[in-house]
């Protein structure tokens, strides 16, 4: 759609934008500089996935992001530019990951050996070591298989390649559920190629040299 009469003579338009997530708000902010914008939102608040709530703790008020709100400057160049244009303060984010199953019966955290084996029983757990082996195999092979995945689901890809329940239920599905705020039981229905491509683009399948993640200061 051409929104100008000519390069030197813009026509002021009435623009409707549906949805007040990051895409809608960014478009509204940019277009409002030259046009009349009306924003439509079905919810009773704006912000979409971004939603910070505050609660009182024993140490004072704490701001909590109910969504998984982080970005990195490599994968999100336009968002980075928007934050800089608006002077939005950001800070480095701790991107740690931990899993707890069965009310603490089985737990581990990523990042270091201390976290992986914080629960000493993991040292002699066949299920845990199976997860580690298949994690390394998936991280190594899944990107290479992108061209042959076609339209199959993540569940189908994992089944065809012999990945077991430990890897699915104790690592891959909880990680995806945390990132996308979706039930872990639904992750397997995602298209395998889209899932793996997202993970590759965001450095999630790299064991080292991962991107530096940031978040908005104060939520």
Positions of predicted regions on the chain:
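Mobile amphipathic helical/loop "lid" adjacent to a hydrophobic cofactor/ligand pocket
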Residues: 72-207
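Short, intrinsically disordered, charge-balanced linker/junction segments flanking boundaries
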Residues: 209-219
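Glycine-rich FAD pyrophosphate-binding loop
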Residues: 32-56
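Conserved beta-strand segments of alpha/beta enzyme cores
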Residues: 36-38, 63, 89
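Extreme N-terminal leader/targeting segments of oxidoreductases
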Residues: 1-15, 34, 55
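N-terminal glycine-rich dinucleotide-binding loop that anchors FAD/FMN and/or NAD(P) in oxidoreductases
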Residues: 53-79
């Amino acid at each position: 759609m051409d929104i100008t009469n000519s390069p030197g003579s813009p026509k002021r338009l009435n623009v409707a934008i549906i949805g007040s997530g990051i895409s809608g708000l960014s478009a509204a902010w940019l277009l409002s500089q030259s046009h009349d914008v009306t924003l439509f939102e079905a919810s009773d608040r704006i912000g979409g996935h971004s939603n910070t709530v505050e609660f009182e703790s024993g140490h004072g008020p704490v701001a909590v992001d109910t969504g998984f709100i982080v970005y990195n400057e490599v994968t999100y160049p336009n968002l980075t530019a928007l934050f800089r244009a608006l002077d939005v303060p950001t800070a480095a984010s701790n991107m740690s990951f931990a899993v707890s199953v069965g009310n603490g019966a089985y737990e581990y955290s990523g990042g270091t050996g201390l976290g992986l084996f914080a629960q000493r029983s993991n040292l002699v757990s066949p299920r845990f070591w199976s997860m580690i082996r298949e994690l390394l195999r998936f991280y190594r092979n899944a990107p290479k298989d992108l061209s042959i995945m076609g339209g199959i689901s993540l569940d189908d890809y994992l089944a065809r390649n012999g990945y077991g329940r430990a890897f699915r239920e104790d690592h891959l599905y909880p990680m995806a559920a945390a990132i996308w705020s979706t039930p872990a039981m639904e992750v397997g229905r995602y298209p395998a190629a889209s899932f793996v491509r997202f993970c590759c683009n965001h450095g999630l399948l790299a064991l080292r040299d991962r991107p530096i993640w940031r978040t908005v200061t104060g939520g």
